[in-house]
Amino acid sequence: MAAYTEDQLAEFQEAFNLFDNRGDGKIQLSQVGECLRALGQNPTESDVKKCTHQLKPDERISFEVFLPIYQAISKARSGDTADDFIEGLRHFDKDASGYISSAELRHLLTTLGEKLTDEEVEQLLANMEDQQGNINYEEFVRMVMSG
C-alpha cells in the first residue's frame, strides 16, 4: 500500500466519516464512489465496481476496507491525462481545426462511456461554443480536468 502522510490519512478519514450516517465507522458500499469523489478522485461507476465486485451490494465497509479501494482508484485514474482525452477528441475533428461541433460533443458525452445527463452536458458546455456552434476541444478538456 502507498505510504500516506498522517495529514492525508486524516483527510481520507474525515471524508469517510461524513458518509458514515450510523456512526458505526462504516459506509454503505453504494457510497464509495461519492466518497472517492469527495476526496478529489473521479472514478466511473465501472471503476468502482471493479474494485468492489467481491463485496456484497448491501454491505457496509470500514475505513480499512475503503483505503485500498481509494489507492486502486487513485493509481488507475492517474494515467488519464488531458493529452489522452484531447487525442481521443481529435478523431472527431474532421478538418484538423481544433474544433468539433457542440452537437457532436454533446452526443459523445451522453452516449459513450460514463454517460452524462443532458443537464450535466449543458453545465459543461456553458459558454464554450463559438458563433458557429463549435467547441475548441483542447480548451474544453483542460477546463473539465482543472475542475
From Swiss-Prot:
This is Myosin-2 essential light chain. SMART domains: EFh. Myosin is a hexamer of 2 heavy chains and 4 light chains. One of its GO terms (biological process) is actin filament-based movement. GO terms for cellular component: cytosol; myosin II complex; myosin V complex; myosin VI complex; myosin VII complex. Pfam families: EF-hand_6, EF-hand_7. Ca(2+) binds at residues 93, 95, 97, 99, 104. Keywords: Calcium, Metal-binding, Motor protein, Myosin, Phosphoprotein, Repeat. It comes from Drosophila melanogaster. Residues 7-42, 80-115, 115-147 form the EF-hand domain. GO terms for molecular function: calcium ion binding; myosin binding; myosin heavy chain binding. PANTHER family: FI08416P-RELATED, MYOSIN LIGHT CHAIN 1, 3. The modification Phosphoserine is found at residue 30. The keyword Metal-binding applies.
